[in-house]
Amino acid sequence: MHRKDFLRLLALTPFVTHNMKLQAFSKITSSFSSTKKMPVLFTSHGNPMDIPLGLNANPFLTSLAQIGEKIRKEHEIKAILVVSAHWCTKGTLVNVSSAPDTIYDYYGFPPEYYTQKYLAPGSPETAKEVTKLIPKVKETTEWGLDHGAWPMLKHMFPKADVPVFEMSIDYYQSAQYHFDLAKQLKPLRDKGVLIIGSGAVVHNIKEAGKRFFNGNMKPYGWDIEFDQWIKQQLDKRDIQSIVNYEKNKLGLIAAPTPDHYVPLIYSLALMEKDESLEHTFEEMLPAFSNRGFKIG
């Protein structure tokens, strides 16, 4: 308990009578641990070529570092919750491990892709708060920090000194389901939890591969069009159109599978009415978007 909270509790003590229910008193004091409302992030975790790169090696990685520095200056971060495109499950799980492993969930890359470690501690106590807010979410310790988390976090918080845990994406549910579920995480923002949706507005592996592996990094055109459409909806705060992305003629081309798109929906579900939204980075590669933004 912070000193200021102790003093407030001390001041209340004379007013606690036998007739005052413990539950009511608990309700008063439950707000003492609240902190300044945390922002919410949506970010890409970069393309595979970014993984072995050091700090500030390109503009995208520099932007991640700048975001992390700014948030640490303005907020006291208790823990980070990452909703990663790389942890898809049947049902929704939350990792309550105290020491999450570094997961290399990619294949066929040079040795330097498999030697890096991001040894941030977990936050079991905070992770269990998720199951209290959303009882259908189940606990597990059989996961760690995957490609959607540590390659981004090692630039945003390079000291790995902020506790991190992940929540999975139920692959078999609709975009609207995820939007409604994510709303229930809002109380965590008042408890010092930085929530990050890590995915990509545009992520078509098949089409990206056709150009990436030939050294052609020029976008197709349709990828830019969809990415800009998303930006326009963000600026208009037309969140429902973003949730209903499959109705856009390019929606299922830009996101043929939901895994990388759904983290965007989680981040947007946490936005309050009239809350600010700042575009933090914008870059297009073939069939792949590095767009990111900060809410709050």
Residue ranges and their predicted role:
Residues L53, I169, A175-L181, K206-R211:
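A short secondary-structure junction signal
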Residues M1-P14, K21, K27:
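N-terminal secretory signal peptides and thylakoid transit peptides that target proteins
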